[in-house]
Amino acid sequence: MSKIKPSKGAPYARILGVGGYRPTRVVPNEVILEKIDSSDEWIRSRSGIETRHWAGPEETVAAMSVEASGKALADAGIDASRIGAVVVSTVSHFSQTPAIATEIADRLGTDKAAAFDISAGCAGFGYGLTLAKGMVVEGSAEYVLVIGVERLSDLTDLEDRATAFLFGDGAGAVVVGPSQEPAIGPTVWGSEGDKAETIKQTVSWDRFRIGDVSELPLDSEGNVKFPAITQEGQAVFRWAVFEMAKVAQQALDAAGISPDDLDVFIPHQANVRIIDSMVKTLKLPEHVTVARDIRTTGNTSAASIPLAMERLLATGDARSGDTALVIGFGAGLVYAATVVTLP
């Protein structure tokens, strides 16, 4: 019987560079209030969001990804031709096939890199990071580009008081490559499909295609609404506050890291109240820098963690070599948490 030759990858993997792209247009809460009965004070108190970025016609999922990836490659000092795989996490690329990752890989100038999309909602970056780590250690790619990108403004119902203010657009990317020491810890991830209805698309694409007005939601003028993201806010809040803090602690335990050892906490930027509650539950020391990028970026789903990471490093609130806990959670419901060394 023939034996398969063992793969030869790196001993460990690490994040080597990070980049972000935020669309030019900044949208304050006042714009959101044009179509919902609310107030700037209420939006800020409930979510922490003051502004968000919305993409223009030329700021496509691919275009934003290329911009963020170029910055990540420059930060890592790696030429695109050395990228062996491109992993894109998104829920807002509307073409079912081909994967947008293939276009991004080509536009960046990779040398026929493997390229594919994944859909894991707001946990997508963590899923992509886990896949990238596995590829580097297994040996199927020396360097992997992981991208979280969203145009959630395309999936926002501006007449839905519960969600109209939440979502923003943008792209974040990291380069994952070989390391001689552990720099991406074990991933604690999973799903709770029994809660799938708590965050979902209002109408499936097949129902929207049929166009039976009697079964489709209508706007205030009687027009059929484009499918949008909806959520049961209180149910999601309770799940995130009580269950995701447990997952975050499990990730710390798996990495052999205590809260006192942490330098930075980068949770998915879903809601500032969720973030603050997790900090309290985890009993994080005051010296731990906590990402609150949501204030000016909004909830960008799969892009939120790399965007927040990029901003912390750019502003000096976090430093290269810092130990950071990252956790994403969202539609599915799904989650992924790990401890990383910042690039």
UniProtKB/Swiss-Prot annotation:
CC per GO annotation: cytoplasm
The reaction(s) this protein catalyses: malonyl-[ACP] + acetyl-CoA + H(+) = 3-oxobutanoyl-[ACP] + CO2 + CoA
Listed pathway(s): Lipid metabolism; fatty acid biosynthesis
Ranges annotated as spanning the membrane: none
Keywords assigned: Acyltransferase, Cytoplasm, Fatty acid biosynthesis, Fatty acid metabolism, Lipid biosynthesis, Lipid metabolism, Multifunctional enzyme, Transferase
Active-site residues, record numbering mapped to chain: C122, H268, N299
Subunit description: Homodimer.
Protein name stated in the entry: Beta-ketoacyl-[acyl-carrier-protein] synthase III 1
Organism: Streptomyces coelicolor (strain ATCC BAA-471 / A3(2) / M145)
Taxonomic path: Bacteria, Bacillati, Actinomycetota, Actinomycetes, Kitasatosporales
